[in-house]
């Protein structure tokens, strides 16, 4: 059963009446451009046909009663009172979005019953958290008829995750869930928020293979990577690493390396990755899938060697996929790192070969069974 249908059904069972409306917000997969978003750089994701559905109806008070179907938990809070953190981690994504919507729209106090469910795997690097944030933001906009653009909702989602949940994410995930376009990858300039859509190549599929090694980015490694990037930006005297050219980096690389080896390696990844994204857009426009495959491979190598966010299981999956796909197409880790998924752009005629190669080897090598998803690029958040 699709999340949209399940949300509607479970709302009726849990609340005792039928939901008025349902919102769907997609997850996302990032084709190339990893950890560049919080460095004001470039990314090239697409929204995918897995996401979060929220069925909801207005109440005649200011209470939000939120039922999380997948874990059978409920959270309740009152919009007429200051919104405080919940003991449930998932509920803080909801509360955080509503809290920061109220900062922009102080009059918003419309209560609601909500039931939500997702088919985005948790901690997989496919933005289950952003899908939750954007679905809640859209729900609030509908409930209160609020004058918020989808871009504003995306930035509120990022703010909630940064300040209320405590994860220093960039803005790519939320922008993609809000603004995705059917059959398009979208290059996002994470500083200007300009979007450049480019069609997914005809005859190619997007395959996402989940290593089923889970990560949790709220603590530790993700935030330390961000701090190392900020150190490098201060070293170069710029607002963000987006502003450092390859030439300038090379000129001062030895000096940075002597001061801070990790900051040097992180900056090397970010600066080269931004260039790869720009080249990937041109490769897609030219339908040059050999070039795109090379760029994806370069991105993965850089994440492994310089940003140091891959793990052996992910590296092995990428090796298998690259062999199965060949030169026309590519594979790399996608998401924050330390587990999660790889993304593949694979010729349609090689999809089953890829599936078989992975199935025959990955579990045998790692003791973990992968999950294989074929995805389509889809529209961003919408009412159903």
Curated annotation (Swiss-Prot):
Site (Transition state stabilizer): 28
E.C. number: 2.7.1.6
Binding site residues for ATP: 123-129
Record has DNA repair as a keyword: no
GO terms for cellular component: cytosol
PROSITE patterns to which the protein is assigned, alphabetical: GALACTOKINASE, GHMP_KINASES_ATP
Positions with a binding annotation for substrate: 34-37, 222
Main location: cytoplasm
Superkingdom, natural source: Bacteria
Catalytic residues identified in the record: 173
Pathways involved: Carbohydrate metabolism; galactose metabolism
Catalytic activity of the protein: alpha-D-galactose + ATP = alpha-D-galactose 1-phosphate + ADP + H(+)
The protein's enzyme class: transferase
Compartment list: Cytoplasm
Binding site for Mg(2+): 129, 161
GO MF entry, a single one: ATP binding
One annotated GO biological process: galactose metabolic process
General function of this protein: Catalyzes the transfer of the gamma-phosphate of ATP to D-galactose to form alpha-D-galactose-1-phosphate (Gal-1-P).
Family: Belongs to the GHMP kinase family. GalK subfamily.
Protein name: Galactokinase
């Amino acid at each position: 059963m699709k999340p949209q249908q399940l949300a509607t059904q479970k709302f009726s069972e849990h609340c005792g009446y039928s939901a008025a409306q349902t919102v769907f917000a997609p997850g996302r997969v990032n084709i190339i451009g990893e950890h560049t978003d919080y460095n004001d750089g470039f990314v090239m994701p697409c929204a995918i046909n897995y996401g979060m559905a929220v069925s909801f109806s207005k109440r005649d008070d200011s209470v939000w009663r939120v039922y999380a179907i997948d874990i059978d938990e409920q959270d309740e809070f009152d919009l007429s009172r200051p919104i405080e953190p919940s003991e449930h981690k998932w509920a803080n994504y909801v509360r955080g979005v509503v809290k920061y919507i109220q900062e922009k729209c102080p009059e918003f106090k419309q209560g609601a019953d909500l039931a939500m469910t997702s088919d985005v795997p948790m901690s997989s690097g496919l933005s289950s958290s952003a899908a939750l944030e954007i679905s809640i933001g859209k729900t609030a906009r509908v409930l209160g008829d609020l004058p918020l653009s989808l871009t504003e909702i995306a930035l509120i989602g990022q703010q909630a995750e940064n300040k209320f949940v405590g994860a220093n994410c960039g803005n790519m995930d939320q922008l993609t869930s809000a603004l995705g376009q059917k059959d398009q990858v979208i290059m996002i300039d994470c500083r200007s928020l300009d979007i450049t859509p480019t069609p997914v190549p005809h005859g190619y599929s997007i395959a996402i293979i989940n290593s089923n090694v889970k990560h949790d980015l709220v603590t530790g490694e993700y935030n330390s990577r961000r701090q190392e990037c900020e150190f490098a930006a201060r070293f170069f005297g710029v607002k963000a690493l987006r502003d450092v050219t390859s030439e300038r980096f090379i000129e001062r690389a030895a000096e940075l390396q002597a001061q801070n080896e990790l900051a040097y390696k992180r900056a090397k990844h970010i600066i080269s990755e931004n260039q790869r994204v720009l080249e990937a857009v041109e490769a897609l426009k030219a339908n040059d899938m050999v070039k795109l495959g090379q760029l994806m491979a370069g991105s993965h190598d850089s994440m492994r060697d310089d940003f140091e966010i891959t793990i052996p299981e992910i590296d092995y999956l990428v090796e298998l996929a690259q062999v199965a796909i060949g030169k026309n197409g590519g594979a790399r880790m996608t998401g924050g790192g330390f587990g999660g998924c790889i993304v593949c752009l694979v010729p349609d005629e090689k999809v089953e070969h890829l599936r078989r190669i992975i199935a025959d080897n990955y579990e045998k090598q790692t003791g973990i069974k992968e999950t294989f998803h074929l995805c389509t690029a889809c529209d961003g958040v919408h009412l159903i």
